[in-house]
């Protein structure tokens, strides 16, 4: 898939006049169109809903855009629930999936009448004790072992290892949990599972759906409860590399439909609503980190230093993740220079790219780092006293809007109990 920026150099320079680099910028048009594609792909299911993972991009402007497109939200903490509430989400618009859940978080989810997804069998009594048992309840499934998509030309395709994951229940634990929940007043039950991350395959969701649909049939027979919802969670990925193929959401939706009709309909369970939580797929490609080249260094390697660092985009440092880079204004120039593109943290893993072939980069060039619309700004941090960058929305009409200002030193010091001692630093 060819990686094309949604900003031109001229557009970036216009934004920079108002918002200095570094900043994350999001494409409203792209996000809206993608949300509509998702809804269309699963329109065959009357109860379908996409629950956008708030952790991927926790900005109220983005959440409100997705709400307008018919999406709900997937929350995992008290603050995500609070953010979603002020954006107008409540009740069945919220999926609450948490683990090792604090009392305050569970109480808030119950107060909002969210769909609560229990991660562990012991959470049944915990939920009843701290909040109460709602009519609608989910349990998270962990099948153990290794999850794969079978054989390919490259060999056995291992996608992930659920058996090593801390999440979810065994089938036996789920069955006992549903029985207990039913006895305590729950009436409608859901199944949730997340078995692999960032899959670049149209087969992942259909394969997962087949597993969960068969599980639903077994659980309903074993317990007599009504399985009304199945949440395929996230895991549908995006092509971070240009040589990767983009997932076809229409093909994915059709694959899930076929499994639905093969397994659930014959079992008399054709009323089951399908939910998804595609945070990365929904917004990932429609965000970018825009930075300026401020230094170059020539020692054993060639380095380009940016005014952004891993505090603005953690994924390359934390996971060794690849993010494509475009030098705005030089899209058509030959990539004949090898660089390490780095930030200024006192950590040697603060590298956006290693041995990357790029056009010649000059001081002052605008560097566009692709695919930061999910798990980008959201994973920002303050190590080394670095400050989180601004967030900008590129509106559908071509204008831009600041939707989160950059942090300031005052923000950094705000929670310290000696702030009065810092007052002279902030006086004009």
Language-model-detected regions and their locations in the chain:
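Active-site-proximal loop/turn and secondary-structure-junction residues that shape catalytic pockets
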Residues: 56-58, 79, 100-102, 120-122, ...
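Charged (often Lys/Glu-rich) extended helix/loop segments that serve as interaction or gating elements
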Residues: 261, 265, 269-428
């Amino acid at each position: 898939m060819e990686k094309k920026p949604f900003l031109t150099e001229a557009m970036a320079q216009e934004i920079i006049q108002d918002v200095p680099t570094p900043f994350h910028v999001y494409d409203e048009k792209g996000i809206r169109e993608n949300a509509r594609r998702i809804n269309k792909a699963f329109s065959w299911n009357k109860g379908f809903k996409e629950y956008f993972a708030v952790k991927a991009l926790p900005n109220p402007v983005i959440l409100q855009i997705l709400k307008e497109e018919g999406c709900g939200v997937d929350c995992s903490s008290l603050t995500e629930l609070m953010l979603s509430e002020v954006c107008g989400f409540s009740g069945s618009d919220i999926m609450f999936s948490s683990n090792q859940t604090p009392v305050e978080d569970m109480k808030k989810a119950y107060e909002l009448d969210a769909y609560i997804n229990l991660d562990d069998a012991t959470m049944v009594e915990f939920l009843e004790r701290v909040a109460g048992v709602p009519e609608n309840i989910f349990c998270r499934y962990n099948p153990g072992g290794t999850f794969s998509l079978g054989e390919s030309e490259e060999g056995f395709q291992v996608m992930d290892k659920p058996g090593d994951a801390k999440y979810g229940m065994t089938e036996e634990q789920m069955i006992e949990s549903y029985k207990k929940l039913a006895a305590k007043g729950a009436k409608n039950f859901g199944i949730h599972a997340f078995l692999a991350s960032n899959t670049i395959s149209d087969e992942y969701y259909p394969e997962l759906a087949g597993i969960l649909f068969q599980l639903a049939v077994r659980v309903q027979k074993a317990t007599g409860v009504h399985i009304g919802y199945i949440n395929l969670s996230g895991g549908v990925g995006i092509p971070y590399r240009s040589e990767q193929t983009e997932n076809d959401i229409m093909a994915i939706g059709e694959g899930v439909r076929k499994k639905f009709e093969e397994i659930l309909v014959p079992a008399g369970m054709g009323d089951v609503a399908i939910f998804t939580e595609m945070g990365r797929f929904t917004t990932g490609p429609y965000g970018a980190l825009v930075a300026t080249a401020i230094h170059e260094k020539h020692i054993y390697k060639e380095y380009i230093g940016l005014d952004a660092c891993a505090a603005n985009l953690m994924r390359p440092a934390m996971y060794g993740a690849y993010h494509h880079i475009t030098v705005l204004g030089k899209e058509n120039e030959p990539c004949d220079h090898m660089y390490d593109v780095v930030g200024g943290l006192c950590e040697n893993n603060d590298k956006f790219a290693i041995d990357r072939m790029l056009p010649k980069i000059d001081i002052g060039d605008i560097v566009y780092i692709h695919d930061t619309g999910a798990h980008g700004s959201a994973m920002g941090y303050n190590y080394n006293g670095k400050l989180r960058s601004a967030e900008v929305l590129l509106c559908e009409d071509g204008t831009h809007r600041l939707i989160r200002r950059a942090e300031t030193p005052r923000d950094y010091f705000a929670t310290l109990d000696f702030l009065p001692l810092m007052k002279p630093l902030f006086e004009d």
